[in-house]
């Protein structure tokens, strides 16, 4: 009996180690593809990265949601079987979501039923599949071993178990081994030493009839292909079936298996010469020893081969994962996901006293994380259609951008229909808070303002040219420039930002969005935007920084001149050889006139009507940092009123007072 017990234990280990992983991911190839880095890709990353927290936040560990607008809307489902811990469930869904992001590079649909550390389900698609019974594409896996027991008896027991479980799962009745979300786990005695353990799950959105049909078809398919194997799995987009001869899941921990029938007496045949001595212990010992001598080395050898194979497989998988990560240009955002409860606690439940301000897309709150870090929490408005687009852009774009003159994104939250961005907290608020407040203007002397102009220029240059992506901000304005404790500028608010292709120079849109006072003429009137439209906005910003006045105001040189905005006012002053009248009076005489004049000159070059006439950012930075470059005469700015009352200086003439006369520079 001892030898038999040893043999049973070794068989158990053989079965356990011989089973393949049940996870088989399907990146559907016949449902279309999407453009990497495009809007669908952005939406897919957002919904998959937030799926673990969204699922575990639900009492039933089931989440069905979507993000975006057609044709780039992404639908997703995540779920775990009943009894799963939140930690195991989150881990399972996170691993599978990461797999899809790395290994389904442009497929618009994929699904998987991974089994570790618990059984979970992840699916995404560009079309709604809620309530739809999808039987294809189908996958199956089998145990490597064959059945040793009577196949006819096994089939009878297996079919009885399958029928009982399909009925329990599809009728959605809660029993000790099933729940009301189309799930069932059960077992049946096969032999005194072996039980059949089976687990079934349909997606909870299916009707009872569709669930039954899906599971029954899976059972039929398995019988057709693999009925002699010791275990197997059939996976479809809408249902899952697995059975095996060992407890592969904690779902079976509380199951009570019916007691096996009494074990029949075992008769050991004796050699013919010893028939008169039925109690010959030597002969009996030799037979058992032979069995053990043959069985143990064989099983150990198989185990060694399996372990070696497993180690080699893991090494190969690790290499492939490292290679995929190193080749991917898009950083995953999973590590940046915050749960809603954390953000709610950080902002004192979005208390009014924590509110820093409010814009067109939502409110901004000051928060403090549990580790003591101060953060700025941007809670997008649920009523704003633009808010959804803003969230998608900011959450993905800003994670790719690292520059001292760009605000840093710490994370985001996409739960309970909330869209929240968590930024580093910048202590001195935004530029407009100081620039347009008569009591605070004096805190920004010319030295600080000149430093701010240079920092903004370097930040835009990074967006346009120096980052891995070519990004047009499209909403540069004083309220989107934050100031840190040392008054260093940080560009923020990437809700309208657009990624350009390597060779792309211009984009077009029918949806004009942003702040009109900073818009270039070609964008405001025709929806055309490019790097040159950002440069126009930069020029407006420079004039505001120098003057302490808003471009949206109305200004005129004297009673006889036509009123205009700050840009036209600055252009008139320039052409009438009195640009320093633009300077903020709070400076007094504490500024260098040549430095200020040069900045006004550069700003007027940036706001020229023709985009081709505006300098590139690399040229602008050279103009700001070098006095040896001769600047061209600025042409008329955009929206300039052609008034006969205005006396213009000839386009071809230059004044020594307003242009540097050293070596020429061509942009």
Swiss-Prot record:
GO molecular function: ATP binding; protein kinase activity; protein serine kinase activity; protein serine/threonine kinase activity
Record GO cellular component, one term: membrane
Chain spans, region Disordered: 259-282
Residues forming the catalytic site: 475
Highest taxon above the source species: Eukaryota
Binding annotation for ATP: 356-364, 378
Compartments where located: Membrane
Transmembrane segments: 293-313
UniProt-listed Enzyme Commission number(s): 2.7.11.-
Listed Pro residues bias regions: 259-268
Catalytic activity: L-seryl-[protein] + ATP = O-phospho-L-seryl-[protein] + ADP + H(+); L-threonyl-[protein] + ATP = O-phospho-L-threonyl-[protein] + ADP + H(+)
Sequence positions bearing Phosphotyrosine: 423, 523
PTM sites of type Phosphoserine: 479
Ranges facing Extracellular side: 25-292
Domain Protein kinase: 350-629
Gene3D superfamilies documented for this protein: Gnk2 domain, C-X8-C-X2-C motif (3.30.430.20), Phosphorylase Kinase, domain 1 (3.30.200.20), Transferase(Phosphotransferase) domain 1 (1.10.510.10)
Matching CDD domains: Gnk2-like, STKc_IRAK
Tissue expression summary: Detected in root, stem, leaf and flower.
Keyword line: ATP-binding, Glycoprotein, Kinase, Membrane, Nucleotide-binding, Phosphoprotein, Receptor, Repeat, Serine/threonine-protein kinase, Signal, Transferase, Transmembrane, Transmembrane helix
Induction: By salicylic acid (SA), by a bacterial pathogen infection or by oxidative stress. May be regulated by WRKY DNA-binding proteins at the transcriptional level.
One Pfam family matching this protein: PK_Tyr_Ser-Thr
Family statement: Belongs to the protein kinase superfamily. Ser/Thr protein kinase family. CRK subfamily.
Protein name from the UniProt record: Cysteine-rich receptor-like protein kinase 11
The species this protein was found in: Arabidopsis thaliana (Mouse-ear cress)
Gene: CRK11
């Amino acid at each position: 009996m001892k030898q038999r017990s040893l043999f049973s234990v070794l068989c158990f280990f053989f079965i356990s180690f011989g089973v393949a992983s049940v996870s088989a991911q399907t990146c559907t190839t016949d449902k279309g593809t999407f453009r990497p880095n495009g809007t669908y890709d952005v939406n897919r990353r957002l919904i998959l990265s937030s799926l673990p927290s969204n699922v575990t936040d639900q009492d039933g560990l089931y989440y069905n949601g979507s993000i975006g607008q057609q044709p780039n809307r992404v639908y997703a489902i995540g779920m775990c079987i009943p009894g799963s811990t939140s930690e195991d469930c989150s881990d399972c869904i996170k691993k599978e979501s990461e797999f899809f992001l790395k290994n389904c590079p442009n497929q618009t649909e994929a699904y998987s039923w991974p089994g570790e550390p618990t059984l979970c389900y992840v699916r995404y698609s560009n079309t709604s599949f809620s309530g739809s019974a999808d039987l294809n594409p189908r996958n199956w896996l089998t145990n490597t071993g064959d059945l040793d027991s009577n196949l006819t008896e096994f089939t009878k027991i297996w079919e009885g178990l399958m029928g009982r479980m399909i009925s329990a799962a599809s009728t959605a009745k809660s029993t000790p081994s099933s729940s009301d979300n189309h799930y069932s786990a059960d077992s049946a005695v096969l032999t005194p030493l072996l039980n059949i353990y089976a687990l079934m799950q349909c997606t909870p959105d299916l009707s009872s009839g569709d669930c039954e049909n899906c599971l029954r078809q899976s059972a039929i398919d398995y019988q057709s292909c693999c009925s002699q194997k010791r275990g197997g799995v059939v996976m479809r987009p809408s249902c899952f079936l697995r059975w095996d001869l060992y407890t592969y899941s904690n779902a079976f921990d509380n199951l009570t298996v019916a007691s096996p029938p009494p074990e029949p007496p075992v008769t050991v045949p004796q050699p013919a010469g010893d028939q008169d001595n039925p109690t010959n212990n030597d002969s009996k010992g030799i037979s058992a020893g032979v069995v053990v001598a043959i069985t143990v080395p064989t099983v150990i050898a198989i185990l060694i081969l399996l372990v070696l194979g497993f180690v080699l497989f893991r090494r190969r998988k690790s290499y492939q994962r490292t290679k995929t990560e190193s080749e991917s240009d898009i950083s995953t955002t999973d590590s940046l996901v915050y749960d809603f409860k954390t953000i709610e606690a950080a902002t004192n439940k979005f208390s009014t006293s924590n509110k820093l301000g409010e814009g067109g897309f939502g409110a901004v709150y000051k928060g403090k994380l549990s580790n003591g870090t101060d953060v700025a929490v941007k809670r997008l408005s649920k009523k704003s259609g633009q808010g959804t687009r803003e969230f998608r852009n900011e959450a993905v774009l800003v994670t790719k951008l690292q520059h001292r003159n760009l605000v840093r994104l710490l994370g985001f939250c996409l739960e309970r229909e909330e869209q929240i961005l968590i930024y580093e907290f910048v202590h001195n608020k935004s530029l407009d808070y100081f620039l347009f407040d008569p009591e605070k203007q004096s805190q920004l002397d010319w030295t600080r303002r000149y430093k701010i102009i240079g920092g903004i220029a370097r930040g835009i240059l990074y967006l346009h040219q120096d980052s891995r992506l070519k990004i047009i901000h499209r909403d540069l304005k004083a309220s989107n420039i934050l100031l840190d404790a040392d008054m260093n500028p940080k560009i923020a608010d990437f809700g309208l930002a657009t990624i350009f292709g390597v060779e792309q120079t211009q984009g077009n849109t029918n949806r004009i969005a942003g702040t009109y006072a900073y818009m270039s003429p070609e964008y405001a009137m025709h929806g055309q935007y490019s790097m040159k439209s950002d440069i126009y906005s930069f020029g407006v910003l420079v004039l505001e920084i120098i003057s302490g006045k808003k471009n949206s105001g109305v200004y005129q040189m004297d009673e006889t001149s036509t009123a205009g905005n700050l840009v036209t006012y600055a252009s008139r002053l320039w052409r009438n050889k009195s640009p320093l009248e633009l300077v903020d009076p709070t400076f007094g005489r504490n500024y260098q006139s040549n430095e200020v004049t040069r900045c006004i000159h550069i700003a007027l070059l940036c706001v020229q009507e023709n985009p081709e006439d505006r300098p590139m950012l690399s040229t602008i930075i050279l103009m700001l940092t070098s006095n040896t470059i001769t600047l061209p005469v600025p042409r008329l700015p955009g929206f300039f009123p052609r008034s006969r009352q205005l006396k213009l200086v000839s386009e071809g003439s230059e004044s020594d007072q307003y242009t540097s006369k050293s070596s020429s520079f061509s942009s």
